[in-house]
Amino acid sequence: MTPMLLSAFWTYTLITALTPGPNNILALSAATAHGFRQSIRVLAGMSLGFLVVMLLCAGIAFSLAVIDPAIIHLLSWVGAAYILWLAWKIATSPAADENARPKPVGFWVSFGLQFVNVKIILYGITALSTFVLPQTQALNWVIGVSILLALIGTFGNVCWALAGHLFQRAFRHYGRQLNIILALLLVYCAVRIFY
């Protein structure tokens, strides 16, 4: 992977892992309402489910690459379009709602959430088909990057859980500006896929 593509990969994965989504909002809410210690079961369920979903995404993306390598080029364009759409949604979205507090959930509920979490499914397929498979189709790399994607996602969840009220205050005061900055960084990622 070239340094420019690697920088786009890291920018995309970190922004996606750290922006609001079902996992991050649930981690934030669980830690804010019940404390970090009580939210560990939720985080553990998310992490294991995230890993399983990333491995499933790897299987799907890898299978498509083996069936027809031209599909990977097409998926790169689809991935870039998705990143631009995500940038638009982030730039035009209001600041996070600090009053959203779901009831406490446990390990299995947060594990099961991963299989219907469109954000992480698109995150996995986009990252693999856009940044990895055009460079290599070595199965060990695809699996390794899938594990890395799950670790990056877990990092984002833990950050939101640890930050608790700090993130809520920051989004309340600077949410709009932060969304625009994150959106511009995602546009950078989409451009870097091809240049």
From Swiss-Prot:
- Where would you find the membrane-spanning parts of this chain? 10-32, 47-67, 70-90, 105-125, 142-162, 177-194
Chief location of this protein?
membrane
**Record flagged with keyword tRNA-binding:** no
Molecular function terms from GO: amino acid transmembrane transporter activity
Q: Which UniProt keywords apply?
A: Amino-acid transport, Cell inner membrane, Cell membrane, Membrane, Transmembrane, Transmembrane helix, Transport
What InterPro entries does this protein's entry cite?
LeuE-type
**Location relative to the cell:** Cell inner membrane
Q: Name one GO cellular component term.
A: plasma membrane
Q: Which residues lie on this side of the membrane: Periplasmic?
A: 1-9, 68-69, 126-141, 195
Say if the entry is tagged with keyword Membrane: yes
Q: Which reaction does it catalyse?
A: O-acetyl-L-serine(in) = O-acetyl-L-serine(out); L-cysteine(in) = L-cysteine(out)
| Bilayer disposition of the protein | Multi-pass membrane protein
State the Pfam families in the record.
LysE
Q: Which GO biological process annotations does it have?
A: cysteine export across plasma membrane
Q: Which residues lie on this side of the membrane: Cytoplasmic?
A: 33-46, 91-104, 163-176
Q: What does this protein do?
A: Exporter of O-acetylserine (OAS) and cysteine.
The family annotation for this protein states: Belongs to the Rht family.
Q: What is this protein called?
A: Cysteine/O-acetylserine efflux protein
> In which organism is this protein found?
Salmonella typhimurium (strain LT2 / SGSC1412 / ATCC 700720)
Instruction: Read off the lineage from the record.
Output: Bacteria, Pseudomonadati, Pseudomonadota, Gammaproteobacteria, Enterobacterales
